[in-house]
C-alpha cells in the first residue's frame, strides 16, 4: 500500500502531497519552473515577512491558491478555529514537491499488515493478559501493584484529576456506510478541503487491501467512513 491521498475542493480534485500533478491541475502548467515562479510570485504578493498566525504562515510558504483551496477550509474544520486564531508553528513547512510523485512518504518501505492492524495486534497479544472496559484511574492501586512500572496513555489532565484545569481536546467521529457498489471514490483517502462540506475526509477501506478480500477475490460492495472533527467536552 502506498499512501497517495486526493484532495477534493468543491468539484475539483487535486493530488496530495502538493506536487507537479497538483500544480498542473491548479494552474494548467507543465514544468517545475512554472510552478516555482507562480508560488514565489504569490508569496511575495502577500507582503508577509514575519508570520504571526497559521494563515500568514501558510500564505508565506505556499501562496494564496494553495492556501485557499487546500489548507484553509480543511484546517479550520479540523481545529474548529479560524486559521488566524491558530499559531504559526502548526505549519512549520509545506511539503511542496516539484516532481510528478503522489507518494506521500519518502520512506524506503511502507505498507499495511496483511489482513489489517486488528489481525496484527491479535497476534501480538497472544499469551498476554488483556483487560477491557476498565479504568486505570479508578483502580490505580490495583494496577500499580502488579507491575514495577506502569505506562499510562490516557489524558494527562485526567491523570492529575484536573487540578490544573482541563485541556482543549479535539475529537473525531466516524459515520460508516455499506454501499451496494464496487467502487465509491477509487482511492483509500479523499480529503474534503472546502469548509462547507461537514466531513474532513472519506475513507474507502477496500483500497487499503487493493480492493480484494483476504483470499484475493474482488469485492462487489464497498464500505466508506466519513470523518468529522468536533470539540471534545468533559463528561
What would you call each of these model-derived segments?
Residues 1-2:
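Conserved FAD-binding subdomain of flavin-dependent enzymes
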Residues 5-9, 190-192:
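Short acidic-hydrophobic surface loop/beta-edge motif
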Residues 7, 12, 22-149, 157-160:
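Active-site/ligand-binding neighborhood in enzyme catalytic cores
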Residues 16-18:
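Short capping micro-motif at the N-terminus of alpha-helices
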Residues 134-235:
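Mid-domain catalytic core of redox enzymes
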